[in-house]
Amino acid sequence: MAHIKVVGGGTSVRGSTLQVSAQADFGYGVHNEEGLFDPGQPLLLELCRDARMLVCISPSVDRLHGERIRQYFRTHFAPEQYRFLVLSTSESNKSIENVLRICEAAKAFWLDRHGLLVAIGGGIVLDMVGFAASIYRRGIRYIKVPTTLVGQVDVAVGVKTGVNLSGSKNLIGTYYPAYATLNDRGFLSTLPAREMRCGLAEIIKMGLVCDPEIFTALEAHFLPPVSRHLEHPLPQEAVLGAMVRMIEELQPNLFELNLERLVDFGHTFSMSLETVSGYAHAHGEAVAMDMALSACLSNELGILGEAEFERILALLEVVGLPVFDEALCSVDAMWQALMEVNVHRGHRINLVIPARIGEGMFLHRLEDVPRDALARAIRRMSVLSQRHAVAALGSAGEPLERASGA
């Protein structure tokens, strides 16, 4: 569970200026549990026993799991202790208006400074509820219960909250740690194949720039001779490995005072690909295209070897993730994306590219990316994506008939 305390500090007088000094110490737990809402599972009860709670849940999770979740609350908490709020979860609903709606619902339920917000759903719900928790009464506790693979390996371990504004993704938000994060992989059994692929993009990301064993575990799982499909449980060494590597990368730099972040691999061109497509591309799909283009650029610059570049494309291909969008990935559009990121990251693009599988490196400035090299990478990805489109037919990436559980 999270703790925040002020340590050390003091006050000094310098002429007419009073200087205040304080330091905050942050900590939070990411729990991986089975059967989180089984009647005999005590974890949520122990965390929330005496708290008043507003439980925010996505419509699809409410439809698929709502009765079981509500029964848990009926069993363990008094009726006046909690209230449910169903939140719309499209990118167009990831807005300050919905954050204010959460705050208004919390006020109407008389949630005080000791109250709790509980977020149950995918990344959009978690981001909005976290933002609301960070500003309601200047900050109350909240618990994250991610129900998507992206949520469990990425959003679960970080402290960022945010919503979209003026056509920009996550333009406003805060850094605010959850009181606790509760992962239950049972939720993934009702996740649609597309959402599973999006989560896999984030796991592949960590394998490519931080840990080659994550990448090879996924290769062994999805590629011949094993060739497992998405309905098979993912290798836990890859899932937990991605979470551990994510925490290791985030922990020394939770508030992003250093804007050189390996975890930003796949998150440079992808922001433009998502927004310009009107969010027709899901986040993980945009990340996959970004990773493919960044790997191709690294290869064009003579950094990433040809064999490893082919391995990267092969894994993305067999999982069923897109690697290129001809309509969106023009040289002008991708160069514009770099310029926008240059502003966002303090006039340094800090573009992460794979030097080899398991090791990332930075191209810090715009001048480190020759426009002609980017153009060559885009032309090559255009050709390779045609091969990818043909090979994907009948691959392990074919859609599975699953209910939507995002």
Swiss-Prot record:
NAD(+) binds at residues 91-94, 123-127, 147-148, 160, 169, 187-190. SUPFAM superfamilies: Dehydroquinate synthase-like. Its cofactor is NAD(+); Co(2+); Zn(2+). InterPro entries: Dehydroquinate_synthase, DHQS/DOIS_N, DHQS_C, EEVS-like. Keywords: Cobalt, Lyase, Metal-binding, NAD, Nucleotide-binding, Zinc. Its EC number is 4.2.3.152. GO terms for molecular function: 3-dehydroquinate synthase activity; metal ion binding; nucleotide binding. It is an enzyme of class 4 (lyase). One of its GO terms (biological process) is antibiotic biosynthetic process. It comes from the Bacteria. Zn(2+) binds at residues 202, 267, 283. It catalyses: D-sedoheptulose 7-phosphate = 2-epi-5-epi-valiolone + phosphate. Catalyzes the cyclization of D-sedoheptulose 7-phosphate to 2-epi-5-epi-valiolone. Belongs to the sugar phosphate cyclases superfamily. EEVS-like family. This is 2-epi-5-epi-valiolone synthase. It comes from Stigmatella aurantiaca (strain DW4/3-1). The lineage of its organism: Bacteria, Pseudomonadati, Myxococcota, Myxococcia, Myxococcales.
